Protein backbone atom coordinates (compact mmCIF):
# COMPACT_ATOMS: atom_id res chain seq x y z
CA UNK A 1 0.00 0.00 0.00
CA UNK A 2 1.64 3.25 -1.17
CA UNK A 3 0.58 6.44 0.62
CA UNK A 4 1.62 9.97 -0.34
CA UNK A 5 2.15 12.19 2.72
CA UNK A 6 2.06 15.95 2.10
CA UNK A 7 4.02 18.19 4.48
CA UNK A 8 4.28 21.98 4.38
CA UNK A 9 7.77 21.85 5.91
CA UNK A 10 10.48 19.29 6.60
CA UNK A 11 13.65 21.08 7.67
CA UNK A 12 16.27 19.12 9.66
CA UNK A 13 17.51 22.42 11.14
CA UNK A 14 14.08 23.09 12.65
CA UNK A 15 13.16 19.56 13.67
CA UNK A 16 10.57 19.60 16.46
CA UNK A 17 7.66 17.60 17.86
CA UNK A 18 5.55 17.42 14.70
CA UNK A 19 8.45 16.21 12.55
CA UNK A 20 9.41 13.72 15.24
CA UNK A 21 5.85 12.38 15.41
CA UNK A 22 5.67 11.98 11.63
CA UNK A 23 9.05 10.22 11.50
CA UNK A 24 7.90 7.72 14.12
CA UNK A 25 4.59 7.23 12.34
CA UNK A 26 6.46 6.32 9.15
CA UNK A 27 8.62 3.86 11.09
CA UNK A 28 5.47 2.20 12.37
CA UNK A 29 3.73 2.21 8.99
CA UNK A 30 6.73 0.60 7.32
CA UNK A 31 6.72 -2.13 9.98
CA UNK A 32 3.06 -2.71 9.12
CA UNK A 33 3.65 -3.05 5.38
CA UNK A 34 2.70 0.48 4.33
CA UNK A 35 5.00 2.32 1.91
CA UNK A 36 4.99 6.07 2.74
CA UNK A 37 6.37 8.56 0.22
CA UNK A 38 6.91 12.10 1.49
CA UNK A 39 6.25 15.29 -0.47
CA UNK A 40 7.64 18.46 1.10
CA UNK A 41 9.15 21.81 0.01
CA UNK A 42 12.75 22.14 -1.10
CA UNK A 43 15.21 23.66 1.38
CA UNK A 44 17.21 26.84 0.81
CA UNK A 45 20.25 24.88 1.95
CA UNK A 46 19.85 21.52 0.26
CA UNK A 47 23.00 20.04 1.79
CA UNK A 48 21.48 19.23 5.18
CA UNK A 49 21.19 15.58 6.10
CA UNK A 50 17.55 14.54 5.97
CA UNK A 51 16.60 12.21 8.87
CA UNK A 52 13.83 10.58 6.82
CA UNK A 53 16.16 9.88 3.90
CA UNK A 54 18.74 8.52 6.35
CA UNK A 55 16.04 6.16 7.66
CA UNK A 56 15.41 4.84 4.15
CA UNK A 57 12.21 6.73 3.32
CA UNK A 58 11.52 8.23 -0.09
CA UNK A 59 11.35 12.03 0.08
CA UNK A 60 10.26 14.08 -2.94
CA UNK A 61 10.90 17.80 -2.59
CA UNK A 62 9.07 20.45 -4.61
CA UNK A 63 9.51 24.19 -5.13
CA UNK A 64 7.20 26.19 -2.88
CA UNK A 65 6.76 29.88 -2.18
CA UNK A 66 4.74 32.38 -0.16
CA UNK A 67 2.49 34.21 -2.67
CA UNK A 68 2.73 37.59 -0.94
CA UNK A 69 4.33 40.74 -2.34
CA UNK A 70 6.25 43.16 -0.13
CA UNK A 71 7.68 40.69 2.39
CA UNK A 72 11.04 41.22 4.03
CA UNK A 73 13.47 38.32 3.76
CA UNK A 74 13.17 37.67 7.51
CA UNK A 75 9.37 37.69 7.41
CA UNK A 76 9.34 35.37 4.41
CA UNK A 77 11.62 32.90 6.22
CA UNK A 78 9.39 33.08 9.27
CA UNK A 79 6.24 32.32 7.25
CA UNK A 80 7.94 29.37 5.56
CA UNK A 81 9.07 28.13 8.95
CA UNK A 82 5.72 28.39 10.75
CA UNK A 83 2.21 29.24 9.65
CA UNK A 84 2.71 30.51 6.11
CA UNK A 85 0.14 29.46 3.49
CA UNK A 86 2.49 28.10 0.83
CA UNK A 87 1.85 27.51 -2.86
CA UNK A 88 3.54 25.17 -5.34
CA UNK A 89 3.15 24.51 -9.05
CA UNK A 90 5.68 21.65 -9.01
CA UNK A 91 3.60 19.69 -6.52
CA UNK A 92 0.64 19.42 -8.89
CA UNK A 93 2.63 17.63 -11.57
CA UNK A 94 4.51 15.50 -9.06
CA UNK A 95 1.34 14.13 -7.48
CA UNK A 96 -0.13 13.40 -10.90
CA UNK A 97 2.94 11.32 -11.75
CA UNK A 98 3.00 9.37 -8.47
CA UNK A 99 2.59 5.68 -9.32
CA UNK A 100 0.53 3.04 -7.52
CA UNK A 101 -1.02 5.61 -5.20
CA UNK A 102 -3.56 4.14 -2.78
CA UNK A 103 -4.11 7.02 -0.32
CA UNK A 104 -3.44 10.77 -0.28
CA UNK A 105 -2.62 11.91 3.27
CA UNK A 106 -2.11 15.64 3.91
CA UNK A 107 -0.38 16.84 7.05
CA UNK A 108 -0.79 20.41 5.80
CA UNK A 109 -3.78 22.71 5.49
CA UNK A 110 -4.14 25.73 3.21
CA UNK A 111 -3.06 25.62 -0.43
CA UNK A 112 -0.73 22.62 -0.07
CA UNK A 113 -3.57 20.61 1.45
CA UNK A 114 -5.94 21.91 -1.23
CA UNK A 115 -3.64 20.70 -4.00
CA UNK A 116 -3.52 17.26 -2.39
CA UNK A 117 -7.32 17.19 -2.10
CA UNK A 118 -7.78 18.22 -5.74
CA UNK A 119 -5.39 15.58 -7.07
CA UNK A 120 -6.94 12.91 -4.82
CA UNK A 121 -10.37 13.69 -6.28
CA UNK A 122 -9.06 13.57 -9.84
CA UNK A 123 -7.25 10.29 -9.22
CA UNK A 124 -10.20 8.89 -7.25
CA UNK A 125 -8.20 7.87 -4.21
CA UNK A 126 -9.22 8.45 -0.57
CA UNK A 127 -8.08 11.70 1.01
CA UNK A 128 -7.02 11.89 4.67
CA UNK A 129 -6.03 15.08 6.47
CA UNK A 130 -4.23 15.28 9.81
CA UNK A 131 -4.45 18.36 12.04
CA UNK A 132 -1.20 18.80 13.93
CA UNK A 133 -1.40 22.30 15.37
CA UNK A 134 -5.07 22.67 16.20
CA UNK A 135 -7.90 24.38 14.31
CA UNK A 136 -10.93 24.65 16.60
CA UNK A 137 -9.29 23.79 19.92
CA UNK A 138 -7.22 26.96 20.21
CA UNK A 139 -7.07 29.74 22.82
CA UNK A 140 -9.23 32.70 21.83
CA UNK A 141 -6.23 35.00 21.58
CA UNK A 142 -4.59 32.73 19.01
CA UNK A 143 -7.83 32.37 17.02
CA UNK A 144 -8.10 36.16 16.84
CA UNK A 145 -4.53 36.47 15.61
CA UNK A 146 -5.33 34.05 12.76
CA UNK A 147 -8.36 36.13 11.78
CA UNK A 148 -6.53 39.47 11.88
CA UNK A 149 -5.86 40.77 8.35
CA UNK A 150 -2.19 40.51 7.42
CA UNK A 151 -0.35 43.83 7.27
CA UNK A 152 2.92 42.51 5.89
CA UNK A 153 2.22 42.65 2.15
CA UNK A 154 -0.25 41.97 -0.64
CA UNK A 155 -1.33 38.33 -0.84
CA UNK A 156 -1.78 37.68 -4.53
CA UNK A 157 -2.21 33.92 -4.07
CA UNK A 158 -5.81 33.94 -2.81
CA UNK A 159 -7.03 32.73 -6.20
CA UNK A 160 -5.12 29.47 -5.73
CA UNK A 161 -6.96 28.80 -2.48
CA UNK A 162 -10.26 29.12 -4.36
CA UNK A 163 -9.01 27.06 -7.30
CA UNK A 164 -7.84 24.19 -5.11
CA UNK A 165 -10.77 24.46 -2.68
CA UNK A 166 -8.55 24.69 0.38
CA UNK A 167 -11.55 25.73 2.49
CA UNK A 168 -13.17 22.37 1.73
CA UNK A 169 -10.36 20.25 3.17
CA UNK A 170 -12.44 19.01 6.08
CA UNK A 171 -15.85 18.82 4.43
CA UNK A 172 -14.49 16.84 1.45
CA UNK A 173 -11.98 14.63 3.30
CA UNK A 174 -12.69 10.93 3.68
CA UNK A 175 -11.25 11.10 7.19
CA UNK A 176 -9.97 13.81 9.54
CA UNK A 177 -7.27 12.84 12.02
CA UNK A 178 -6.31 14.74 15.14
CA UNK A 179 -4.19 13.83 18.14
CA UNK A 180 -6.54 15.63 20.51
CA UNK A 181 -9.89 14.29 21.78
CA UNK A 182 -11.24 17.80 22.41
CA UNK A 183 -10.35 18.90 18.88
CA UNK A 184 -12.00 15.74 17.54
CA UNK A 185 -15.21 16.45 19.46
CA UNK A 186 -15.37 20.02 18.14
CA UNK A 187 -14.75 18.82 14.58
CA UNK A 188 -17.40 16.12 14.89
CA UNK A 189 -19.88 18.74 16.04
CA UNK A 190 -19.10 20.93 13.04
CA UNK A 191 -18.98 18.00 10.58
CA UNK A 192 -21.45 15.49 12.05
CA UNK A 193 -21.36 13.13 9.06
CA UNK A 194 -17.59 13.07 8.76
CA UNK A 195 -15.25 10.36 10.01
CA UNK A 196 -13.14 12.06 12.69
CA UNK A 197 -10.45 9.91 14.31
CA UNK A 198 -8.23 10.54 17.32
CA UNK A 199 -4.75 9.39 16.27
CA UNK A 200 -2.23 10.04 19.08
CA UNK A 201 1.50 10.24 18.54
CA UNK A 202 3.69 7.27 19.41
CA UNK A 203 6.87 7.05 21.46
CA UNK A 204 9.69 4.48 21.02
CA UNK A 205 10.09 3.84 24.73
CA UNK A 206 13.39 1.95 24.49
CA UNK A 207 15.18 5.07 23.18
CA UNK A 208 14.29 7.04 26.30
CA UNK A 209 15.05 4.19 28.67
CA UNK A 210 18.64 3.82 27.44
CA UNK A 211 21.01 5.80 29.66
CA UNK A 212 22.38 8.76 27.68
CA UNK A 213 23.34 11.07 30.55
CA UNK A 214 27.03 10.96 29.65
CA UNK A 215 26.22 12.20 26.13
CA UNK A 216 24.38 15.19 27.61
CA UNK A 217 27.17 15.91 30.10
CA UNK A 218 29.82 15.75 27.39
CA UNK A 219 27.88 18.13 25.14
CA UNK A 220 26.72 20.50 27.88
CA UNK A 221 29.18 20.45 30.80
CA UNK A 222 27.26 23.37 32.35
CA UNK A 223 24.61 20.92 33.59
CA UNK A 224 27.04 19.04 35.85
CA UNK A 225 25.93 19.09 39.49
CA UNK A 226 22.98 21.39 38.70
CA UNK A 227 19.22 21.07 39.12
CA UNK A 228 18.32 21.04 35.44
CA UNK A 229 14.92 22.47 34.54
CA UNK A 230 14.31 21.57 30.91
CA UNK A 231 12.01 23.28 28.43
CA UNK A 232 12.07 21.21 25.24
CA UNK A 233 10.52 22.67 22.08
CA UNK A 234 11.03 25.18 19.28
CA UNK A 235 11.71 28.78 20.33
CA UNK A 236 8.41 30.36 19.33
CA UNK A 237 5.72 32.59 20.90
CA UNK A 238 3.32 29.62 21.01
CA UNK A 239 5.82 27.67 23.12
CA UNK A 240 5.99 30.70 25.43
CA UNK A 241 9.55 30.46 26.73
CA UNK A 242 9.34 34.17 27.55
CA UNK A 243 6.87 33.40 30.34
CA UNK A 244 9.33 30.94 31.83
CA UNK A 245 12.08 33.56 31.77
CA UNK A 246 9.77 35.91 33.68
CA UNK A 247 9.56 33.29 36.43
CA UNK A 248 13.28 32.47 36.33
CA UNK A 249 14.55 35.09 38.84
CA UNK A 250 12.22 33.67 41.51
CA UNK A 251 13.33 30.12 40.66
CA UNK A 252 17.02 31.00 40.88
CA UNK A 253 16.58 32.83 44.18
CA UNK A 254 14.82 29.85 45.77
CA UNK A 255 16.99 27.18 44.15
CA UNK A 256 20.54 28.51 43.64
CA UNK A 257 21.72 25.24 41.99
CA UNK A 258 19.01 25.36 39.33
CA UNK A 259 19.84 25.81 35.64
CA UNK A 260 17.19 26.50 33.03
CA UNK A 261 17.79 24.74 29.71
CA UNK A 262 15.87 25.82 26.59
CA UNK A 263 16.38 23.10 23.99
CA UNK A 264 15.03 23.48 20.48
CA UNK A 265 15.43 25.32 17.17
CA UNK A 266 14.30 28.93 16.76
CA UNK A 267 11.38 29.21 14.32
CA UNK A 268 10.53 32.86 15.04
CA UNK A 269 13.64 35.03 14.74
CA UNK A 270 12.21 38.24 16.31
CA UNK A 271 11.01 36.22 19.30
CA UNK A 272 14.34 34.40 19.47
CA UNK A 273 16.13 37.75 19.53
CA UNK A 274 13.94 38.87 22.45
CA UNK A 275 14.88 35.70 24.32
CA UNK A 276 18.60 36.15 23.66
CA UNK A 277 18.46 39.81 24.70
CA UNK A 278 16.71 38.90 27.95
CA UNK A 279 19.44 36.38 28.75
CA UNK A 280 22.05 39.15 28.80
CA UNK A 281 20.40 40.77 31.84
CA UNK A 282 22.30 40.32 35.13
CA UNK A 283 19.56 38.30 36.85
CA UNK A 284 19.67 35.61 34.12
CA UNK A 285 23.22 35.78 32.82
CA UNK A 286 24.89 32.39 33.07
CA UNK A 287 21.76 30.76 34.50
CA UNK A 288 20.04 29.79 31.23
CA UNK A 289 21.42 27.46 28.55
CA UNK A 290 20.27 27.62 24.91
CA UNK A 291 21.16 24.40 23.10
CA UNK A 292 19.80 25.24 19.65
CA UNK A 293 18.18 22.61 17.47
CA UNK A 294 19.20 18.98 17.92
CA UNK A 295 18.60 16.00 15.58
CA UNK A 296 15.71 13.58 16.20
CA UNK A 297 16.28 10.91 18.85
CA UNK A 298 19.64 12.53 19.57
CA UNK A 299 21.38 10.99 22.61
CA UNK A 300 22.00 14.52 23.92
CA UNK A 301 18.25 15.23 24.01
CA UNK A 302 17.54 11.92 25.72
CA UNK A 303 20.35 12.60 28.17
CA UNK A 304 19.00 16.08 28.96
CA UNK A 305 15.61 14.56 29.74
CA UNK A 306 17.22 11.94 31.98
CA UNK A 307 19.33 14.57 33.78
CA UNK A 308 16.44 16.99 34.28
CA UNK A 309 14.85 17.47 37.68
CA UNK A 310 11.72 18.45 35.77
CA UNK A 311 10.35 19.12 32.30
CA UNK A 312 8.51 22.45 32.09
CA UNK A 313 6.00 23.06 29.31
CA UNK A 314 4.68 26.67 29.40
CA UNK A 315 2.97 26.56 25.97
CA UNK A 316 0.02 28.81 25.15
CA UNK A 317 -1.35 25.98 23.02
CA UNK A 318 -0.34 22.30 22.98
CA UNK A 319 -2.63 19.96 21.09
CA UNK A 320 -0.94 16.77 22.27
CA UNK A 321 2.28 17.12 24.25
CA UNK A 322 4.55 14.44 22.78
CA UNK A 323 7.43 15.67 24.91
CA UNK A 324 5.43 14.77 28.03
CA UNK A 325 5.41 11.10 27.04
CA UNK A 326 9.11 11.31 26.20
CA UNK A 327 9.87 12.82 29.61
CA UNK A 328 7.91 10.12 31.41
CA UNK A 329 9.64 7.40 29.41
CA UNK A 330 12.95 8.94 30.55
CA UNK A 331 11.76 8.97 34.18
CA UNK A 332 11.40 12.76 34.38
CA UNK A 333 8.68 14.66 36.31
CA UNK A 334 6.43 16.93 34.23
CA UNK A 335 5.04 20.41 34.91
CA UNK A 336 2.79 21.77 32.15
CA UNK A 337 0.56 24.72 31.43
CA UNK A 338 -3.08 23.69 31.30
CA UNK A 339 -3.55 23.30 27.53
CA UNK A 340 -5.93 20.66 26.17
CA UNK A 341 -3.23 18.19 25.07
CA UNK A 342 -1.34 18.07 28.38
CA UNK A 343 -4.62 18.11 30.32
CA UNK A 344 -5.58 14.86 28.58
CA UNK A 345 -2.33 13.20 29.70
CA UNK A 346 -1.49 14.77 33.06
CA UNK A 347 -3.61 14.08 36.14
CA UNK A 348 -2.71 17.01 38.35
CA UNK A 349 -0.93 15.85 41.48
CA UNK A 350 -0.93 12.20 40.38
CA UNK A 351 1.45 11.81 37.43
CA UNK A 352 2.47 15.44 36.98
CA UNK A 353 1.50 19.03 37.60
CA UNK A 354 -0.78 21.37 35.65
CA UNK A 355 -0.74 25.13 36.17
CA UNK A 356 -2.48 28.18 34.72
CA UNK A 357 -0.25 30.75 33.08
CA UNK A 358 -2.13 33.61 34.73
CA UNK A 359 -1.47 32.08 38.16
CA UNK A 360 2.33 31.76 38.35
CA UNK A 361 2.19 31.09 42.09
CA UNK A 362 0.63 27.69 41.31
CA UNK A 363 3.58 26.93 39.03
CA UNK A 364 6.10 27.84 41.72
CA UNK A 365 4.24 25.69 44.24
CA UNK A 366 4.34 22.72 41.85
CA UNK A 367 8.02 23.32 41.15
CA UNK A 368 8.69 23.41 44.87
CA UNK A 369 7.01 20.03 45.34
CA UNK A 370 9.09 18.63 42.47
CA UNK A 371 12.46 19.90 43.70
CA UNK A 372 11.92 19.59 47.45
CA UNK A 373 10.18 16.20 47.45
CA UNK A 374 12.24 14.06 45.04
CA UNK A 375 10.63 10.80 46.20
CA UNK A 376 7.17 12.16 45.35
CA UNK A 377 8.41 13.53 42.03
CA UNK A 378 9.93 10.16 41.13
CA UNK A 379 6.69 8.37 42.02
CA UNK A 380 4.66 10.74 39.84
CA UNK A 381 7.06 10.27 36.92
CA UNK A 382 6.77 6.49 37.35
CA UNK A 383 2.99 6.74 37.07
CA UNK A 384 3.42 8.76 33.90
CA UNK A 385 5.81 6.15 32.51
CA UNK A 386 3.09 3.51 32.85
CA UNK A 387 0.75 5.71 30.81
CA UNK A 388 3.39 6.25 28.12
CA UNK A 389 3.46 2.49 27.52
CA UNK A 390 0.02 2.82 25.91
CA UNK A 391 1.49 4.88 23.06
CA UNK A 392 3.34 2.20 21.13
CA UNK A 393 4.55 3.36 17.72
CA UNK A 394 3.68 0.08 15.98
CA UNK A 395 0.24 -0.26 17.57
CA UNK A 396 -0.78 3.28 16.58
CA UNK A 397 0.55 2.78 13.04
CA UNK A 398 -1.42 -0.48 12.75
CA UNK A 399 -4.54 1.44 13.72
CA UNK A 400 -3.89 3.94 10.94
CA UNK A 401 -3.24 1.19 8.40
CA UNK A 402 -6.61 -0.32 9.30
CA UNK A 403 -8.25 3.05 8.61
CA UNK A 404 -6.49 3.25 5.24
CA UNK A 405 -7.76 -0.22 4.33
CA UNK A 406 -11.33 0.66 5.31
CA UNK A 407 -11.26 3.83 3.20
CA UNK A 408 -9.91 1.94 0.18
CA UNK A 409 -12.61 -0.73 0.53
CA UNK A 410 -15.35 1.88 0.90
CA UNK A 411 -14.12 3.70 -2.20
CA UNK A 412 -14.08 0.43 -4.16
CA UNK A 413 -17.65 -0.39 -3.08
CA UNK A 414 -18.85 3.11 -3.99
CA UNK A 415 -17.52 2.78 -7.53
Regions found by a protein language model. Give the residues of each.
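N-terminal subdomain of nucleotide-sugar transferases
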Residues: 1-60, 395-398, 415
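Nucleotide-activated donor-binding/catalytic signature segment of Leloir-type glycosyltransferases, i.e.
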Residues: 272-295
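Carbohydrate-associated surface elements
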Residues: 182, 202
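Short hydrophobic beta-strand element within catalytic cores of glycosyltransferases
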Residues: 333-336
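A short helix/loop element that forms part of the nucleotide-sugar donor recognition site in Leloir-type
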Residues: 209-222, 275
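Conserved donor-binding/catalytic core segment of Leloir-type glycosyltransferases
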Residues: 222-239, 245-248, 261-263
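Conserved acidic donor-binding segment of nucleotide-sugar-dependent glycosyltransferases
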Residues: 348-349, 353-360, 369-374
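Aromatic "clamp/platform" in nucleotide-sugar-dependent glycosyltransferases that forms part
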Residues: 316
Amino acid sequence: MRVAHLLRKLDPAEWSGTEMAIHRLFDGLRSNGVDPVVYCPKLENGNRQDPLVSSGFEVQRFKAFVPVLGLSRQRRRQLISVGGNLMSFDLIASLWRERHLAIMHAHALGRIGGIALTIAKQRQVPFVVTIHGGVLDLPEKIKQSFNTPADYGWEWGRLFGVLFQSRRLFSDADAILTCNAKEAALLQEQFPNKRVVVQPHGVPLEIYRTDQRQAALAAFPQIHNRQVLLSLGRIDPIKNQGWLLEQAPIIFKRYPRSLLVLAGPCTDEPYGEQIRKRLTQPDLQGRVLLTGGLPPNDPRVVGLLQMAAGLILPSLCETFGLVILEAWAAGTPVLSARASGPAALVQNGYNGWLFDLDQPEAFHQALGCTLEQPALAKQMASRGAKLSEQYSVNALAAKLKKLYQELIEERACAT
